[in-house]
Amino acid sequence: MSMFNKVVKEFQWGQHKVRLETGEVARQASGAVIVDVEDTVVLATVVGAKSAKPGQDFFPLTVDYLEKTYSAGKIPGGFFRREGRPSEHETLTSRLIDRPLRPLFPEGFYNEVQVVIHVLSVNPEIPADIPALIGASAALAVSGLPFNGPVGAARVAYIDNAYVLNPTRDQLKASSLDLVVAGTERAVLMVESEADQLPEDVMLGAVVFGHEQMQTAIDAIHELVREGGKPEWDWQPAPKNEALIARVTELAHGDLLAAYQLRDKQARSTKLKEVYAATSAKLEEDAQAAGTVAADKATVGNVLFDIEAKIVRSQILNGEPRIDGRDTRTVRPIEIRTGVLPRTHGSALFTRGETQALVVATLGTKGDEQIIDALEGEYRERFMLHYNMPPFATGETGRVGSPKRREIGHGRLAKRALVKCLPSADEFGYSIRVVSEITESNGSSSMASVCGGCLALMDAGVPMKAHVAGIAMGLILEGNKFAVLTDILGDEDHLGDMDFKVAGTEQGVTALQMDIKIQGITKEIMQVALAQAKEGRMHILGKMTSAVSGANTQLSEFAPRMITIKINPEKIRDVIGKGGSVIRALTEETGTTIDISDDGVVTIASTSSEGMAEAKKRIENITVEIEVGQVYEGTVLKLLDFGAIVNLLPGKDGLLHISEIVNERVKDINDYLKEGQQVKVKVIQTDEKGRVRLSAKALLNEAAASQSDTPPQQ
């Protein structure tokens, strides 16, 4: 009899067969599930602490998605030959898994939970992110932790006007949509997508299609839990302190109401801090008078936050003005300025209300492309977008350093929004880096990065296919009443039930990201929200088009210029030289950057047109074919007993035999030639090994013959 209580469930899912198993591996974890999708195998584990730490006032969930290089049959690079810090892809996938799981833990559950997913085997055609999300959901479901799942997930492509479930990587290349959707049996919780200017109804259809198809995975997880699940935890939320809630409401409700009449963010934040401090102080006085212990600040803070949420939500649902005085459909005032930084290649300052992004575009060469060593193989990225949000953007102090998960995620969202509207590499040969520096933030800074990024690219002279704008939307739902909010503030993001970001052109959507915190948001509500988002996007596009009608026709004087020439691929090694000596000398002496592709396309880039012209001339000289009959003015490099080595072109030498110098017999070559002497020679022979024979006397004989043919003058 086996020592393992192994449970396996298999199901057909689109074009793939999926296998879930639990009970054999990682048995000391709270829950562990292995997911196998056509040889892409992940191990998802969950460990939950049995109790919360004293004073804990938030839910400490961590999700780590880790790719092992052995899964692709590789050994890691680097000195230590082992996996190091998470890659950007691992960080983004960790966020992708975290987002639909987090809202399904019950309110008041503050026990630490850690989800770790290891990628153990990779089929290059099957991305591991969807199996990882399914595995994390299944591991939580079998663990018995208080979790209102399970969660299903699906990737949806759109090929030839049809939706495709969980496409392969090759299918994704032909698709105009890459959408990941996750949710429960009843509701969608998360959407992440990149699209090629698709209409809203196609995007919504993809979400609905994905939600329908993921039910197969959810059913399989239910079956796995029935046979291999652990007993459910006997966890109950701490009973609400009704007396404390009543007292805090009595002390603070009026002041909180007054605070939310202040339209300026800084003034409102100051007032709210005063209310929090005054309420805590008053409660401490009450406790001292009664001889009891006052409630801790975290508990009081949670009660105050709930009161804030009720105030803001009820005002909006009752049709009253929002926090900053707007109605539900109005976009904040927009100011646009381009060319703000004198020596950058392109720059824009995009301000929407109290959110501001300073965005800079830099043009580079092929050598500046990012080389990514992924499990499925190495590839290059010609377009990079990096998002930075320092603490001063919200008037706070904090750590400044390497980007956090949030910054990496926001940067990727902005990149998704812009990438489909960039010119192809054939149309515009530059590599491109965009950096968004958030200088002020009060909601929707990632969408400000999209708008500012588009404007900075146009300022840099990048011929964009269309203007791209982004807008962040919110939603508040109470029973049958709901309100969709255009261009949400930071506070509305925290207090709402859904936030979603839509970016696109006049023609359609290029990126859509949704995070839904509650169940019960229907297709009809999402339809209304997307229509209202389109209205807001069109308004912003109008402002952007008025400010910048199109890309600059001239590149910045500080941006590199490029010329491209084609050489015989067999001559590439001559241009590079032994150990790179020739190309290194070329770049240093001409001040250029030179990239050579395997098919012989040479790209020369420099801010100096003279340097580019010189580099081009020298490369043409190196790669020119030496043909019989051509005449060159060469330099004597070396004298030998039987002749001289003459340099014709850089890297091209020939032999001038002693018998080919003059017509008479030469006893001592030194009587006729010196090293460094310029000599005119004709190519009389070449062979398959590239050896060249030269003649000087042939030119003398030709000159004599032409003179004898000339009739005497009268």
Swiss-Prot record:
Class of enzymatic activity (EC top level): transferase
Gene giving rise to this polypeptide: pnp
Compartment(s) where it occurs, according to its Swiss-Prot or TrEMBL record: Cytoplasm
Organism: Burkholderia ambifaria (strain MC40-6)
Catalytic reactions on record: RNA(n+1) + phosphate = RNA(n) + a ribonucleoside 5'-diphosphate
GO molecular function per UniProt: 3'-5'-RNA exonuclease activity; magnesium ion binding; polyribonucleotide nucleotidyltransferase activity; RNA binding
EC number: 2.7.7.8
Protein name: Polyribonucleotide nucleotidyltransferase
UniProt-annotated binding residues for Mg(2+): D493, D499
